[in-house]
Each structure stands twice: as structure tokens, then as C-alpha cells.
């Protein structure tokens, strides 16, 4: 399978895999902070040029330790339920929290309203 991302891995280290990473025995994520920041800046530039709002899709990337890299450049987060909405509100305070869900639980909705700035409903039946 061909890689879609043509950038060299480990751009922060000049494409060289640091020795301390070469013998890692367990599966793990190694994130390139420089690449995350560059991508966040790019998203911010697109938002500024177009007037759109860029949101962090937490379903795809909920590594909240990395939210500070995105926070200056994004309008907020996107959540698919109560717990992601709370995560977005807690980890990006002052930013927007958008919620989209196929079905909302009645017993969670009041709490969800505490975190959500925007809620998307699939149909009038959800209201």
C-alpha cells in the first residue's frame, strides 16, 4: 500500500530515527510535535483565508496531551457524544464544542448542554 503522506517521518530530527526509538519493544504512538504544529498552522491559515471554522475531530484524534498544539489555530472540537464533549470543553477551555450524534441519550442530554456550543440533529425526531 502506498503512503499518502509523502513527508519523511521524524521531520523534527531531520528524518533520522532517534536511537532511543529503534529498540522499542511495545506498540506505541510516536508523535512528531513539529509536524503537528505545522499541520495545525496550515489548518489555521485555511480557516483564516476562507472564513470557515476548523474543528478537531476527537473521534479520530483524542490524544488530549496534544491539544495545546492545535488550540491556537482551531475554533474548537467536534464530539460524538457526552464524554467527547466534556473532553473538548475541559481540554480546550474557551473554544467551541460541536456535537453530532446519530442518537442522543435522554439521560445525558442535560449534561451535554453544559458543554456543547452547537448540536446537530439528524432529524426532527431527535428534537
Pin down the residues of each PLM region:
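Active-site mouth loops of central-metabolism enzymes
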Residues: 27-33, 98
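Alpha-helical packing segments of well-folded alpha/beta enzyme cores
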Residues: 36-39, 43
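Glycine-rich phosphate-binding segment of PLP-dependent enzymes
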Residues: 17-18, 39, 68
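Active-site-proximal beta-alpha core segment in soluble small-molecule metabolic enzymes
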Residues: 52-126
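Generic N-terminal amphipathic, Lys/Arg-enriched alpha-helix
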Residues: 12-29
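Adenylate-forming
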Residues: 36, 126-127
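Acidic, low-complexity proline/glycine-rich segments
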Residues: 2-16
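N-terminal glycine-rich anion-binding loops that anchor highly charged ligand groups
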Residues: 12-16, 42, 48-62
